[in-house]
Amino acid sequence: SIPIRMGNEDFKYIHDIYETADSELWLASVGMGVVKARIAGTPDNPVIVDAQRYIINDGELGSNYFFTIYAENETNLLFGNKGYGVFRYNETTNGLEPVSTHKYENMTLNNILAIGKDSSNNYLFGTSYGLIKYTSETSYQLFNAKNGFLNNTIHAILRNSSDNFWLSTNLGLINFDTKRNVFRSYGFGDGLKVVEFSDGAAFRDSRTGTLFFGGINGVVAIRADGRSEQLYMPPVYFDKLSIFGEQYNPVSYTQLYLFL
């Protein structure tokens, strides 16, 4: 382990790490904010030669729960915070600034657990209350259980292609198309043995395109093998019948003709 001292205490509770090309580490902590650290030494004996801490609300513990780091490039970094939304690193001011001051209708939307971005520059914010497709402070869409999602909590987001993403939840995986705003869910009934996933436990193999999602009882791998998606037609059941406003029992009809 490499100790990181910040004043009189160790920097701990690290939840996410991002490494830049010039041996610089960004660390997101659940409770202690964000640290930028420079690594020196050798591969067998790495040392931290410089570390700078970034906090919000004067370092108050409950305000500095940072769960995830998303890098648009080497200098444009976003940090997901539990309770206070998304922050961006400002290289000019050398500080964190909020991406949005929007007051969502549900405060759990500010619990940011995962971040992604599509080809149209829409951000995807995985929250405790669903997925936010964010264009600007005044333009965003929310997708959650009310829209048919398996579960509201989005633990991780991985990009499969330019506008196709996989999301992990507490009840399975969701394949989401940001271009068409359509999705398909995969849970226990679809053969998944792991359905309850963990915060940030996701990885994309850039060489093979394979996606990995970690859950409480194992790992799910999604391989980009070029197979075409199979069409699925769910069973259709009629439980009500209304003819000119009058209710009938569908079971009473041996045949039902619908003219469109």
What are these regions, as identified by a protein language model?
Residues 11-17, 25-30, 61-67:
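Solenoidal tandem-repeat scaffolds enriched in leucines and small polar residues
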Residues 30-34, 82-86, 128-132, 170-174, ...:
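Loop/turn residues immediately N-terminal
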Residues 38-43, 90-94, 135-139, 177-181, ...:
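Short loop/turn segments that connect beta-strands within beta-propeller blades
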Residues 19-22, 71-74, 117-120, 159-162, ...:
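Residue-level detector of Asp-centered blade-edge/turn motifs that repeat once per structural unit
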Residues 5-13, 44-47, 58-64, 104-112, ...:
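Residue-level "micro-hotspots" composed of small/polar
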Residues 24-27, 76-79, 122-125, 164-167, ...:
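Conserved beta-propeller blade signature
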